[in-house]
Amino acid sequence: MEVKERYKKNIGTITEAEQESLKTKKVFVAGLGGLGGYICEMLARMGVGHIKAIDCDVFEESNLNRQIFSTEKSLGRAKTEMAKKRLKEINSSISLDIKNERLEEINSRELINGCDIIIDALDSIDTRLILASAAKDMNIKMVHGAICGWYGQVSVIFPEDNTLKRIYGDKKGKGQEKSIGNPPFTPALVASLEVAEAVKILIGRESSLRNKILLIDTLLQDYEVVDI
């Protein structure tokens, strides 16, 4: 099996057969902001064959500090437009299905249908719970990630799990990032960890974070895995 030159630095971390299998996988990314941009870029560089993603926002100046698809020239343009452009420049061989659409209860199941895994890059607890419910109904595994300030968290959710309810309980609305901000390093770090977990699942390896949550504190550089 001949691995393309562009993927050879993946080999050793994963096998040639695992690299080949990634070409057949389809990943749904919910959101193209701070987390979602990094997630999609890493999936494209890793060689995942099919990336489906949604977002309904345009780039604003406040995105420039942390969102990898945002540039001064992209301000006012749709995040989906810039995502397509950058991902095709990175890897023209992959299939992209990127839509300017909002995730809601009414469309959630249709959006994720046919995907092998879902990666959460949302900033709304309500929308995360909608996504998790749809994933459960469609029997699709999901990687959860969230960020705020110096802090982040990552967890892996199988269809039979009730992880987000355990994490958030009855909380609603936006996450804490609206009040304490987001520097560039937390989305990059949490996105990397989400993609690592997603890739493990896609190639048939065991997840490290099912029924657990990785709590990240970059201020104190403290990383703790907690059972949930």
PLM feature segments, named:
Residues 2, 109-117, 121-228:
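Glycine-rich phosphate/adenylate-binding loop
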Residues 35-36:
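Hydrophobic/small residue at the entry helix of a nucleotide-binding pocket
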